[in-house]
Design a protein with these regions (language model features):
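P-loop NTP-binding core
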Residues: 1-273
């Protein structure tokens, strides 16, 4: 089983970050729907919203205005993860919500680092998540569309990374920069970090371009590319505005089936079916 263990040898949940500094590639949609689909298969899942925009938070049914404490409070040391986690209305799925305050956390962490040379600004999230990870089978992190300190904290805390890639022209643009960031994290901060997989998103079967992009990405990443391809669908785009994952919003849709298939692949790759 490809899972981390604590000092007692007990299996702890796998932490997977969804990362791509390009916006609009289906990162948050995948974070929400992969989390919900894993939960549907009986996995205990914590969805961690690290994007200050908070779309993963609203996408599982919470109003940003009602959030009293968020992952920001975990970062600044005023709360533990267990104080902030919210139970969603979906079985086996919990949320660590985001807030707009998170937008300034990079600067706050840098300032703390200047004031205290022993302050480890890249390890704040890892140390906090390690305290709760044995309560979950998976912790899925929705990263912001940037490679700043928030994302660095996510990569340092994670066992692996899923890169969502849109099936469109310039799909691989910025991928080299992202892979360099992952390699740098491996070298300096988290030698155990691995590439979990590459997910093709927003595929339009009506265009030849989409098929060309799939071939290009498969030749580049080989077996790391998931068999599952996420289609471009109106129902998938609508679901977050209703505060529901696609498997709750439209269970019989192609989008719902695609994310259930992806969850199955993730479970199989990690040997915890």
């Amino acid at each position: 089983m490809n899972m981390s263990k604590n000092e007692k040898g007990e299996i702890m949940g796998k932490i997977i970050s969804l990362v791509n500094q390009k916006g609009g590639v289906g990162k948050t949609t995948t974070s929400i729907n992969l989390s919900a689909s894993l939960a549907m298969y009986g996995q205990r899942v914590l969805l961690l919203d690290l994007d200050p925009q908070g779309n993963a938070t609203t996408g599982v049914g919470f109003n940003k205005g009602d959030i009293e404490r968020s992952v920001y409070d975990v970062f600044n040391g005023t709360a533990e993860v267990s104080d902030v986690v919210l139970r969603t209305k979906f079985k086996n799925l919990s949320l660590l919500p985001s807030s707009l305050q998170l937008a300034g956390i990079d600067i706050e962490l840098l300032e703390k680092g200047r004031e205290n040379p022993t302050f480890q600004k890249a390890f704040q999230l890892r140390d906090k998540l390690n305290m709760v990870r044995e309560n979950y089978d998976y912790i899925i992190i929705d990263c912001p569309p940037s490679l700043g300190l928030i994302t660095t904290n996510a990569l340092t805390a994670s066992d692996s990374v899923i890169i969502p890639v849109q099936c469109e022209f310039f799909a691989l643009e910025g991928i080299t920069q992202l892979l360099n960031a992952i390699m740098l994290t491996q070298k300096k901060l988290n030698p155990e970090l691995k590439l979990e997989g590459v997910l093709l998103t927003m595929f339009d079967s009506k265009t030849n371009l989409g098929i060309e992009v799939i071939e290009e990405i498969r030749s580049y990443f080989k077996e790391k590319v998931y068999t599952t391809i996420i289609p471009r669908l109106i129902r998938l785009a609508e679901a977050p505005s209703h505060g529901k994952p696609i498997i709750a919003y439209d269970p019989k849709s192609k989008g719902s089936q695609a994310y259930l298939n992806l969850a199955k692949e993730v479970i199989e790759r990690n040997g915890n079916a």
